[in-house]
Amino acid sequence: LPGQGSNRGYSSAQLIKQFMTSVWCGANKFEHTEVTRQDEVIRQFWGFERMAGHKSFQRFFNKFDLASNQKVFTALYQWFFKNLQFNNLTLDVDSTIHTRYGTQQGAKKGYNPKKPGRLSHHPLMAFVAECKMVANFWLRSGDSYTSNNIEAFLDDTFEKLQGKKVGLF
């Protein structure tokens, strides 16, 4: 995980705990983390000296790049699926279209039946049917073909599910 550059900064562990607590409490924007920041019970529950503001979360998440995301989430997924009580998993693989409005990184014109000619993303997703958990997710540009790069996606997914017997559906 990215470290803090300042000795006044918050630890990565605190930022993750506080951010996840905010999400569990309904936050869906960085600014919403200010609500849990003011909650004394949450601060005492976690044993934090002080609570981080929304700008701290933005700076923390901006330190991640594709390589560090891959490293962190592969380890997180491996830990999760290793502790899962299922040894035989059914993997559902799908792709979909997300129409984008405005200018979003990676959005391109491609096949879009609902909004032809609009910018979109065309992600690949894999789900474990038994526990309704996302096993892998790759965000691709809108001009990607449905099966484009599926072999590498499945290799990455199987790496995250190491030690489990997987059936595809």
Language-model regions, residue ranges each:
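Short acidic, glycine/serine/threonine-rich loops at helix termini
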Residues: 45-46, 101-107, 135-139
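Short, hydrophobic/amphipathic alpha-helical patches that form generic packing surfaces
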Residues: 14-26
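Active-site-proximal, Lys/Arg-enriched surface segment
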Residues: 56-125
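Basic, short loop/linker segments at the boundary and entry of helix-turn-helix/winged-helix-like folds
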Residues: 1-17, 148
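Electropositive, glycine- and tryptophan-enriched low-complexity nucleic-acid-binding patches
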Residues: 113-165
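DNA-recognition alpha helix
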Residues: 30-45
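Terminal amphipathic helices with adjacent charged low-complexity linkers/tails
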Residues: 37, 50-51
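Short, conserved catalytic/metal-binding motifs centered on acidic residues
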Residues: 18-19, 33, 53, 57, ...
